[in-house]
Amino acid sequence: MNKKELYNKILQLDGLTNEERSELLGLLRKQKKYGLVWEDKPEDVEERLRDELPVLIEDATKAIISDYTDAPNHVLIEGDNLEALAALTYTHEGKIDVIYIDPPYNTGNKDFVYNDSFVDSEDTYRHSKWLSFMNKRLRIAKQLLSDKGVIFISIDDNEQAQLKLLCDEIFSQNNFVSDVIWQHSIQPKGYV
């Protein structure tokens, strides 16, 4: 039975309310999609961005100085990453060749400046808050990258799988180059 025949059969079914019939037809119309599903979680910084234009202020004590006259113009930005990325879209869209980010790993560590515990009782899907956090930043990062631009993302095993799927969705899996694995710390003697 093809989709059209199934559609006609649903229309002819007895004992269904119009609402039930509409629901079944709606399910039939939905296209299958592979990908991540998560609940969008708003952040306080998003409210500020709606009301205020983010402004970057130069701190000469943190200037990156080069002895070369033809040196590229490098910028180190310190501050809320979503605000900084949003500010850069006004001046650097499509102009950045390399982005390196070291986002929270969602490990629950309380010693970080940023929230590193994105799973809570309100999180219907275990990784929703973290994925929502990363999605917003990576979509802006994509806007900033030049055609030859690359992004390096430091992450641990806790969110690596989710990050890979999210990056495939945003940047296309065809643009993925490689995972670079490095040993964070030496294991104690006798570790197997």
Regions found by a protein language model. Give the residues of each.
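Conserved Class I SAM-dependent methyltransferase catalytic core
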Residues: H127-I181
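Hydrophobic alpha-helical scaffolding
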Residues: V75, I153-D157, Y191
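Short, glycine/acidic-enriched loop or turn micro-motifs at the edges of active sites
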Residues: E83, Y105, E159
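Generic beta-strand/beta-sheet core signal
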Residues: I99-P104, F152-D156
